[in-house]
Amino acid sequence: PEPEPEPEPEEDVIVINVHGMGSDRFSGNRLFNSLEQNGLVFGDMAIYHRHSDLSGAGKVLFSVANMVSPGHFQVPEGEEFSTPGISFFLPLPCYGDAEHNFKLMLQTAQMVSSELGGNVLDEKRDMLTPNKIDEYKQRVKVFCRK
């Protein structure tokens, strides 16, 4: 008999990390300004979210958390706050077009990284390579077929 095909996952989370160069840390106000200029809104769970509507209304497409546990941001502390990095995450299945949401999250992570002088890393905190991006795209496609 033929082996049973692997069941497709019911859910997944695509993670892209943005980390400071070496031991550099991202400072609060500079980080928060970059996230906000790139369409993210501070909200639920004290983290940033990209909504379907740029005004901050509508469904959440993806979110950004502090890389350091417990993951939230201390926005009121502004300049006193710093972190070695941030984590962008796209839960699957998601609202809307998963491929579009992934592309938007990747572009946003690259923009924030460029503005802050950081590195874009994968979920294991290794450099994000074109092969890894392709792997992420394949994982996203599984949910586009459902």
Residue ranges and their predicted role:
Residues 1-10:
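Extended, low-complexity intrinsically disordered regions enriched in serine/proline/glycine/threonine
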Residues 13-19, 88:
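Active-site-flanking beta-strand signature of metal-NTP-handling nucleotidyl enzymes
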Residues 20-22, 68, 92-94:
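Beta-strand elements of well-folded, non-transmembrane domains
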Residues 87-146:
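Well-ordered alpha/beta subsegment
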